[in-house]
Amino acid sequence: MAKKGKKYQESAKLIDRTVEYKLDEASKLVVETAKAKFDESVELHAKLGVDSRHADQQVRGTIVLPHGTGKDQKVAVFAKGEKAEEAKAAGADFVGAEDLAEKIQKEGWLGFDVAVATPDMMGVVGRIGRILGPQGLMPNPKAGTVTMDVTSAIKEIKAGKVEYRTDKSNIIHVPVGKVSFGEEKIAENINALMQAILKAKPASSKGKYIRSLTIASTMGPGIKVNPLQFAKE
């Protein structure tokens, strides 16, 4: 643990915590401060000027990042018959119906990153909602994961589709790549995500929309990013 702490402290010295960096500078720093022996993920954290307790101020959407996330997303699909066959052909990792729901319910199995369901299967999926919901795995029409077009849904997820949504603290947390992507690809992913978040601004949101932005690698320190470079508020 002491060794990890030393690396973190060394990385932290490279960052001025009083500065909100330009995107290219922040992306360069997040690569330089990643000292772990594994390929660290990079996450963006955006604090928004909304009140997500109100339904009309919840910010939520999806985007296929230009360079993906660098993670092989495991996809579970709840479907029957022809749609189940389509899901298998499209590259779904797990396909089932009541049997899949039962495995989750009885064994507590959650060996996937995203769940997709056809609309007719939501009655079955609903029974395990209290297991899937807290893990952020519940299929949702707004996220494009409740659909008859299972082929497109699976391909988009595998290509790097991510969902962004405000949590109870009005913060969005999204993976935007791996350190191995390099600064340019990380910056391009962040820019694409920020444009999507800006477009999703609720009409009822008043005042400053993007309150703060931070990016960090898995084991690295947080790096502040100037939100004004993405759009004038």
From Swiss-Prot:
Q: Which CDD domains match?
A: Ribosomal_L1
Q: Which SUPFAM superfamilies match?
A: Ribosomal protein L1
What Gene Ontology terms for biological process does this UniProt record contain? regulation of translation; translation
InterPro entries according to UniProt: Ribosom_uL1_bac-type, Ribosomal_uL1, Ribosomal_uL1-like, Ribosomal_uL1/biogenesis, Ribosomal_uL1_3-a/b-sand
Q: What keywords is this UniProt entry annotated with? A: Repressor, Ribonucleoprotein, Ribosomal protein, RNA-binding, rRNA-binding, Translation regulation, tRNA-binding
Q: Name one GO molecular function term.
A: structural constituent of ribosome
Q: Name one Pfam family in it.
A: Ribosomal_L1
Instruction: Name a GO CC annotation attached to this entry.
Output: large ribosomal subunit
Asked if the keyword Magnesium belongs to this entry, the reply reads no
For this protein, the record's PANTHER family field holds: 54S RIBOSOMAL PROTEIN L1, MITOCHONDRIAL, LARGE RIBOSOMAL SUBUNIT PROTEIN UL1M
Tell me its family.
Answer: Belongs to the universal ribosomal protein uL1 family.
The UniProt function text for this chain reads:
Binds directly to 23S rRNA. The L1 stalk is quite mobile in the ribosome, and is involved in E site tRNA release.
User: What's the subunit arrangement here?
Assistant: Part of the 50S ribosomal subunit.
- Name assigned to this protein: Large ribosomal subunit protein uL1
Instruction: Name the source organism.
Output: Finegoldia magna (strain ATCC 29328 / DSM 20472 / WAL 2508) (Peptostreptococcus magnus)
